[in-house]
Amino acid sequence: TDVMLGTEGNLLESVPENCHQIRLKNPILTNEQLAKLARVKEPGFKAQKLPMLFPVRSGPEGLEKALEYLFMLADEAIEQGVNIFILSDRGVSREMAPIPALLATAGLHHHLIRRETRTQCALVVESGEPREVHHFALLIGYGATAVNPYMAYETIYDMIDQGLVTDIVYEKAKANYIKASMKGVVKVCSKMGISTCLLYTSDAADERSS
């Protein structure tokens, strides 16, 4: 279930720099893990948040423009050395609606393939949408290296706080949720004949654009 974050080197060249990546034990991140990634200061790693939001009043046209803006921000950031993108829908309000996480992830993934910069960065999704195995599998399958389902964690916390779930502390319940979700994702991978989550990430980035 290990996944790697950072710039991928040339597969045809065996050099130490190709190993300079961040290893995660699984692609489902806690809020604390995501916060560490966002603040990463190690040489060779630079993270940036990209908003998955658009003005409600702008309608469908606003959604399209927001996606184009997202792609533009990513292109500029790559030129500045950013190699970890955190696609975030935090900040949703009556005025700002979220871009569907799968649309933003898949859209940016294929945009970067067209720009021939996909292997220079990793996509991490911070979203309130994913909560089930199917959601995680889709996001990973369409380009996300890791996912932070912050709303699922909030739901678990509220259920314990309100007494709907008893005899378990929050940290243990969260760990159980992540473990169960990962078992489901691994099962989805295995049904496709894929043995690791790393290879399932957009089918290895669409087999590196074929």
Where are these regions (language model features)?
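Glycine-rich phosphate/ribose-binding loops and adjacent secondary-structure elements
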Residues: 47, 51-182, 188-192, 197
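Extended, highly charged accessory segments
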Residues: 1-69, 75, 79, 86
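Conserved small/polar residues in nucleotide/adenosyl-binding loops
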Residues: 200-206
